[in-house]
Amino acid sequence: MTRAQFKTRDTCISCGSGDLQRLSDGRFDQGPLREFLLRDPWGESPVPYLAGQLWRYVKCGTCDTAFHANVLTPEWNDINFSRWMSAEAIAEFERTHGGPDRLFYRAMHYTKHVLQLASLIEARPLRVLDFGCGNGEFLAICHQFGFEAVGVDRSTARRDKAGVNVFASADELDGRPFNAITLFEVLEHLDDPSGILKMLRGHLAPGGILILETPDCSGVERIETMHDYGCIHPLQHINGFTPETLRGFAERLGFEEIGKPVSHVTTSPVKVAKTEARRVLGPLLSLTTQQYFRLTG
């Protein structure tokens, strides 16, 4: 059987430094990683293609950003997102990792973002690009609030399932600027996140809003537990951001972090009180990898 092919990222994905420090490494077909891969739902299993192949997780000695140095080549990443992550595999993963409650809370989560964008941006109609939009759930909520919203997603299975306007590539966009661009749990999947964000910056109106959200990989340096695997899956989550490194990543590309306005998607006084408490105590609470930025300059 043909083995999957990898390329090496030998400079930092955030600052470009070549000072990379090894955190952990191993073979795909050995240890806990092999067992975790075998448990996951797949269309066509990637495990036979990964026999003897090496993974290597590193950290930048200059800016502390951590990432997998060995990533699939473009050809094999296309296989990853079409054959391995098939529509059936995605549906099974979502079924076993959630259910109706997960969908409900995700809708609430997205609605809060919509209300916050409406508060931050005066322009109407408000134009939003959701990059890596998946099934288009956030876009659907944007449309309900009267936004002009389109998405981009490279997964054929997810594009086919979406009931809204989703393109395979940003090259298909019409060139009109967007007031806001969102990347919900996308940066961790990208071979070249800096290059992608530079490209997206060109589609954002002056003073436009950028929302970034990734898993928080604070303290994760190796793959020993399911939590580790979920954070830095070497086929899917190839970049491991923390609140500090995510902020630094965006700031290097010309974005300034801003506070999120308060929004309440509830009639519960208790939940409103908790939201207000988080707003007031925000600087004292733990940092998060859900961050808002404004394009400067």
Please name every model-derived segment.
Residues M1-F184, P193-M199, G259-V265, K271-T275, ...:
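Conserved N-terminal segment of class I S-adenosyl-L-methionine
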Residues R27-P41, L212-N239, E244-F249:
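Short, glycine-/aromatic-enriched active-site segment of Class I SAM-dependent methyltransferases
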Residues T65, E188, G219:
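Active-site micro-motifs of SAM-dependent methyltransferase domains
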Residues A149, L210-L212:
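Hydrophobic/aromatic residues located in beta-strands of well-ordered beta-sheets
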Residues F184-D191, Q236:
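Short catalytic micro-motifs in class I SAM-dependent methyltransferases
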Residues L190-D191, L204-P206:
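Helix-to-beta-strand junctions that scaffold the AdoMet/dcAdoMet cofactor pocket
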Residues F249, L253-F255:
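A structural motif corresponding to the C-terminal end of an alpha-helix
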